[in-house]
Amino acid sequence: MSLKGSKTEQNLKDAFAGESQANRRYLYFAAKADVEGQNDIATVFRSTAEGETGHAHGHLEYLEKECGDPATGEPIGDSVSNLKAAIAGETHEYTDMYPGMAKTARDEGHDEIADWFETLAKAERSHATVSYTHLTLPTNSGV
């Protein structure tokens, strides 16, 4: 039975997203603990974040084989494919996701958050440009 299109594929995508978010949260918590001088707690959060990264990578390895990038659906695996998937993701973020979020925030009167989303859209465009630059380097001439 194919993984693509299955409930298991969706479960892997959901688990990847959850583990990835946990990693980022725990690193944020570790930074907060550092500011508070709670070095032992910061260490616990960093260690846990590292474990969550391993879990997320495991999910991604299963998705890589048949399903591709869980965010874009683009094939992933080798560096050229990974750059193309990154460009697709970053392009979506700066052309659709963040502009739409900024509009909603502004419509709801959250101007500071709208400004934040607009700033992030610019950053994502820069990320896409950097990835595209590396994709078109002569060392990737087989693209």
Regions found by a protein language model. Give the residues of each.
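Acidic/histidine-rich alpha-helical segments that form the ligand environment
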Residues: A15-G18, A22, F29, G77-Y132
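Transmembrane helix-bundle signature of multi-pass membrane transporters/permeases
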Residues: S47-A49, L120-A121
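Amphipathic alpha-helical coiled-coil segments
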Residues: G54-E61, S126-Y132
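Conserved small/polar residues in nucleotide/adenosyl-binding loops
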Residues: T133-T139
